[in-house]
């Protein structure tokens, strides 16, 4: 378990950011995604983009080509991305909400993402 995930509590919304981009950015692998989804039962996953990537296998057919993504969505955990400006947050714990557009027959939507510090 990466040290920066030791603060995750059961039922949290997990937002991740990193100052790195490209090949240097950290990758959320399937094992970590399954731990977050199945052991910690997180409510939502929000990777900062650029900065966080997830494991992909472009040679595999769908749905096996993105095991990290599938670990989340297969456990009914929404993924909110790309989150921008989360690197400006200064607290480890924030109140977070994601307000999607109400669009019929869509499985995804843009959101208004709001993080409030110093509430928890």
Label the model's feature ranges.
Residues 1-120:
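Active-/binding-site microenvironments in catalytic and ligand-binding cores
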């Amino acid at each position: 378990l990466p040290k920066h995930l030791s603060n995750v509590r059961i039922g949290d919304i997990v937002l991740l950011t990193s100052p790195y981009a490209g090949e240097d950015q950290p990758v959320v692998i399937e094992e970590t995604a399954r731990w977050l989804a199945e052991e910690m039962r997180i409510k939502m996953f929000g990777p900062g983009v650029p900065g966080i990537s997830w494991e992909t296998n472009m040679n595999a057919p769908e749905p096996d080509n993105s095991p990290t993504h599938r670990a989340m969505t297969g456990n009914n955990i929404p993924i909110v991305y790309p989150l921008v400006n989360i690197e400006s947050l200064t607290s480890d714990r924030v109140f977070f909400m994601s307000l999607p557009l109400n669009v019929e027959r869509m499985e995804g939507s843009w959101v208004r993402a709001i993080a409030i510090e110093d509430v928890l």
